[in-house]
Amino acid sequence: MRVEVVRAPGPLNRPALAEAIDTLGKKSATVRPSSATHRATAQTLSHEITSTDLFATSTATEQQQTLLLAINDDDGAVMGFLKTGVKHLFYLNPRGEYTEIDPICVLDFYVDEVWQRRGVGLQLFQRLLQEENTTPAQLAYDRPSPKLFAFLKKHVGLTEYFPQPNRFVVFDAYFQSRE
């Protein structure tokens, strides 16, 4: 497996790659029952938030969006993606005070079901940390799914956060790492 990094409004002019990204973006937002557990396996979104059209917008450029793609070495198939961008957030602390922050945010993270639980997501996440020269605690997470919470707990030990009205999760360790 290799990881390709594309920065907005980067070149997604390879038709097969663009089609694969659009397909995975739709899968990422769709709720399907898992045959093994009979529970929802995606993010319960009303529409996809990752597509080649959205990646080509001025908003994607303004947010410095990056798309990390896990590519199968054997057949070139896109196995998963991780989309990030910088967002200006108002963080509400437990005392009711707001702080303005501009973290790199995990905006969408999806590995195709056939490739899940094989280390693909972990490799994407580690490559993100390497590319951005950051730590998991220094990131914000846009509406993380239960699967992403479990992933972060298992692989990097992030669990403590104060719920935000904007549904972004900024872990308490974000502020501890800046002290």
Swiss-Prot record:
Lineage, top ranks: Eukaryota, Sar, Stramenopiles, Oomycota, Peronosporales
Pfam families in the cross-refs: Acetyltransf_16
Enzyme Commission designation: 2.3.1.108
Domain of life: Eukaryota
GO-annotated molecular function: tubulin N-acetyltransferase activity
Protein name per Swiss-Prot or TrEMBL: Alpha-tubulin N-acetyltransferase
Gene3D superfamilies named among the record's database cross-references: 3.40.630.30
Assigned keywords, A-Z: Acyltransferase, Transferase
UniProt function note: Specifically acetylates 'Lys-40' in alpha-tubulin on the lumenal side of microtubules. Promotes microtubule destabilization and accelerates microtubule dynamics; this activity may be independent of acetylation activity. Acetylates alpha-tubulin with a slow enzymatic rate, due to a catalytic site that is not optimized for acetyl transfer. Enters the microtubule through each end and diffuses quickly throughout the lumen of microtubules.
Binding site for acetyl-CoA: 109-122, 145-154
Coiled-coil segments on the chain, per record: none
GO cellular component, one term: microtubule
GO biological process: regulation of microtubule cytoskeleton organization
Domain N-acetyltransferase, residue spans: 1-175
Reaction(s) catalysed (UniProt annotation): L-lysyl-[alpha-tubulin] + acetyl-CoA = N(6)-acetyl-L-lysyl-[alpha-tubulin] + CoA + H(+)
Entry-linked SUPFAM superfamilies: Acyl-CoA N-acyltransferases (Nat)
Family per similarity comment: Belongs to the acetyltransferase ATAT1 family.
EC top class named in words: transferase
